[in-house]
Amino acid sequence: MDARDRVVTLFGGGGFLGRYTAQALFRTGARVRVAQRHPRRANFLHPLAAVGQLQVLAVDIRDRGAVRAAVRGSDCVVNLVGILKGDFEAIHVAGARNVAEAAAEAGAGSLVHVSAIGADPDSESAYGRSKGEGEAAVRAAFPDATILRPSILFGREDNFINRFAGMARLAPVLPVLSGATRFQPVYAADVGRAVTAAALHPRGHGGRTYELGGPQVLTMRELMEWVCETTGRGRPLVDIPDPVGRLIARATGWLPGAPITWDQWLMLRRDNVVSPGAEGLEAFGLPKTPLAAVSEGWLTSYRRHGRFAAKSPY
């Protein structure tokens, strides 16, 4: 697709998913305006863009005036901003509303809002609840917005698969919380391509909600087993009973660097998979990248002898 005349404002473009979304947009020729609270975090994008194709702005999504200024003159607006800890209401609800209202006021042709599987205004989890309320705020301000709900994202820079791999490298035994909870990991580059397609083709995708998952559904335990095998770290896995996991989250979740917060524990009580009948990556004509197809390339760094090491017979 050729989008050389399009201006796309990308909120959160300096983050994990932002990296892949920006790259997908660059390939179309679009001019990308990255709105980032800490602009330096987006510096890595400059070598990836053509001359004059990238602009980086200092914007706090909570600042309505700054958000309005960022979207002025935009053809497309994309909101990738999300947090796992902190003030969910300010970021996922008020911030999302600010972006949607500004996009509508600016006359943007499309708005893509990235939410998450599990978004539900009635969720036990404050994270899931804020994501659901944020979707409602976006729909109210910009009815033709495209909402994307990905499952857990994986990619070279992720904090999910890499976290397990780091634990397997250091710990002699790995505890497993909510081992039966199911996930449908989706490659961040696939999601970035879906975001790009939705932003540049609003006629086909505007006003719709998609749930994005990969080709495999794995339990938490199966994911950890796979990481141990791929990294050659045959660690014993110990299932933590739910009452004990609940106690750990309650007692230590408030501490800095806690392994799991109470809200994350609540999120683990629900499967993180695409709903039956939901439209997904196939609606964008995109294949689903298997976890093993790309992750082994970077997980070899966690093996004792790098890429020359054999896999564990775990």
Predicted features by range, described:
Residues 30-40:
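Conserved glycine-rich Rossmann-like NAD(P)H-binding loop of the short-chain dehydrogenase/reductase
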Residues 95, 159-160, 178-200, 207-211:
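Substrate-positioning beta->alpha
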Residues 44, 163-188, 229-275:
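Alpha-helical membrane-targeting segments
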Residues 2, 198-261, 275-314:
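Mid/C-terminal beta-alpha module of Rossmann-like enzyme folds, strongest
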